[in-house]
């Protein structure tokens, strides 16, 4: 059974529109924060990946479906898990919930690239540390 990464956020006034509803683009910020915290959970940061491996993790594509709205002062949980891995990328699913209610479902394709934006192999330490969070397939 795979593990999940969890990250909690609180909705602040700056996150909302005039009606007190989270502005749609801000969910992408929440998802990015959760991915950054997932790296931290396995003992790495984006800066370390750049310094140690000369690589950056970029978003190649993002599919997001808005199921419900979040509002000012809501407490949200972002659950993230790895769907599949290739030599140079991985696919992550992320779900934002408020209690039992799903607010957002997303599928993110992340690619490791060098400083010239060319794909590079996922560093072995990242692959190994993410392994408990894989839920579907590995294509190496």
How would you describe each model-predicted region?
Residues 1-77, 85-140:
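Terminal targeting signals and extreme-terminal segments of soluble enzymes
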């Amino acid at each position: 059974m795979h593990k999940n990464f969890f990250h909690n956020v609180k909705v602040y006034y700056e996150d909302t529109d005039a009606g007190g509803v989270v502005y749609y683009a801000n969910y992408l910020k929440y998802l990015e924060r959760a991915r950054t915290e997932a790296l931290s959970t396995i003992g790495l940061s984006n800066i370390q990946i750049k310094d140690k491996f000369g690589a950056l993790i970029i978003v190649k594509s993002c599919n997001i479906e808005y199921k419900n709205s979040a509002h000012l002062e809501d407490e949200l949980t972002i659950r993230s898990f790895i769907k599949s891995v290739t030599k140079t990328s991985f696919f992550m699913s992320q779900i934002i919930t408020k209690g039992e209610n799903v607010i957002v479902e997303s599928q993110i394709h992340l690619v490791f690239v060098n400083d010239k934006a060319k794909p590079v192999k996922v560093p072995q330490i990242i692959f190994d540390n993410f392994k408990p969070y894989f839920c579907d397939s590995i294509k190496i």
